A protein has these predicted regions:
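ATP-binding pocket architecture of kinase catalytic cores
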Residues: 66-164
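Conserved NTP-binding catalytic cores of kinases and kinase-like/nucleotidyltransferase enzymes
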Residues: 1-109, 228-231
Length: 318
C-alpha cells in the first residue's frame, strides 16, 4: 500500500511540487478538501477522511474513507484523453455487470460514470470507484499466477462480448508481421542482437494468425492485479485498453507480469509458464496463436530493455 499522505506513484520528483505544478494545490490538505467537496456536491458522498494521494504523470489517485466505505478517486488533467477515459469508465461498468472482478464506477448525481469539472488550475476528469480488497499479485505464488492467467482469459471473453463504442480506443492499423518487421527495421536499438536475429527468423516463417482483433487490457501485471488466498479479487486500470490480438495481450502480460511501480524487472520463465497455463485452462491457444505467442513474447521482451545500462537483466532474460 502507498504511504499515508502525498506521494509519487513512480516518478522521482517531490510530490508537493508536482501537486502544485500539475493541479494547482499548494498542499495535500488543500487538494483533499477540494476532492471532498467534489464528492459531496457531484456524487452525494460524505467523505470521512482522505487517507492518501499518489500522483502519476498528469493523473492523481486519492484513497478515501466515506459513508459508502472505502473509495478510490481517479483524477486526470490530460484533456486529450478525456473521451478515452469516459469510454474506459463505461467499459468498467459493463465488465462488472458481466461478473468480471473490476471496480464498477459509482455513478454521479447526474447518472454519469465519469465527470469533468473545473479544478484549481485546469479541467479535471473524475471517476469514483469502490476500493477492492486484496493484495498485489505475488508472482512467487504460482497458484495465484495461474488464477491470474485464467482471469485474463475471462476478461478477454467479456471484452469480446461487450458492446461499447470502440471508436475512441486505439486500434493497431497494421498487421502483426508488418508491425514487428517495421520495429526491427526502424526502432530496434540493438541492445540484444542475437535475440533480434532470432525474432527476424521467427517472423520470416510466421503463419497467418487466424484471430480477429478485439478490445484487450494491455497492462495486465502485478501492480494492477489484487489477490486474496491465491484467488483474484480485482483487476485494475483499464485506462490503456486498445484493440489488438488477444495473444499479444497474453504475451505482453507474461513479459511484464512481475513489474510494480518502481520495481521493474523481467518475469521469471516459470512464472510466465504458469500464467500461460492458467490462461489456456480457460481459452486454449490455437496452433497459429501458439506460434505467434513465441514471437510476441520475444518482441515485447526486446522492447522492455530500457537502455544499455540494463541492470535488471531484461536482455539476459530473452
Amino acid at each position: 500500500m502507498f504511504p499515508l499522505g502525498l506521494s509519487m506513484l513512480w516518478e522521482s520528483v517531490e510530490p508537493e511540487a508536482a501537486l502544485e505544478q500539475r493541479f494547482g494545490f499548494n498542499s495535500f490538505g488543500a487538494a483533499t478538501h477540494w476532492v471532498s467537496a467534489v464528492l459531496e456536491q457531484t456524487w452525494g458522498l460524505t467523505v470521512l477522511e482522505c487517507l492518501r494521494m499518489a500522483i502519476s504523470d498528469q493523473n492523481a489517485i486519492v484513497w478515501v474513507a466515506s459513508d459508502r466505505g472505502g473509495l478510490v478517486v481517479k483524477c486526470s488533467r490530460a484533456t486529450e484523453r478525456f473521451a478515452y477515459l469516459e469510454a474506459s469508465a463505461r467499459l468498467l461498468s459493463a465488465l462488472a455487470g458481466q461478473g468480471v472482478p473490476v471496480p464498477s464506477p459509482i455513478t454521479s448525481l447526474n447518472g454519469l460514470d465519469r465527470e469533468t469539472l473545473e479544478g484549481r488550475s485546469c479541467a479535471v476528469s473524475f471517476t469514483v470507484l469502490p476500493e477492492l480488497a486484496g493484495d498485489w499479485l505475488d508472482v512467487q505464488d504460482h497458484a495465484a499466477v495461474r488464477s491470474a492467467g485464467a482471469c485474463l482469459a475471462e476478461i478477454h471473453r467479456a471484452l469480446g462480448a461487450t458492446h461499447v463504442d470502440g471508436s475512441v480506443f486505439a486500434s493497431r492499423s497494421t498487421g502483426l508481421k508488418e508491425r514487428i518487421g517495421g520495429w526491427l527495421e526502424n526502432f530496434d536499438r540493438g541492445f540484444a542482437p542475437e535475440a533480434s536475429s532470432r525474432l527476424a527468423e521467427f517472423l520470416a516463417r510466421a503463419p497467418q494468425l487466424g484471430d480477429q482483433t478485439q478490445l484487450i487490457h494491455n497492462d495486465f501485471r502485478a501492480a494492477n492485479i489484487l489477490t486474496r488466498n491465491s484467488r483474484i479479487t480485482g483487476v485494475l486500470d483499464f485506462d490503456d485498453v486498445v484493440i489488438d490480438h488477444r495473444v499479444s495481450d497474453l504475451a505482453k502480460a507474461c513479459v511484464y507480469l512481475g513489474t510494480m511501480f518502481t520495481d521493474w524487472r523481467p518475469t521469471p520463465i516459470a512464472v510466465r509458464q504458469s500464467l500461460r497455463a492458467g490462461y489456456e485452462s480457460v481459452r486454449p491457444l490455437s496452433r497459429s496463436e501458439s506460434e505467434w505467442f513465441e514471437i510476441l513474447e520475444l518482441w515485447h521482451g526486446l522492447m522492455a530493455i530500457p537502455d544499455e545500462n540494463d541492470t535488471a537483466g531484461w536482455a539476459s532474460a530473452l
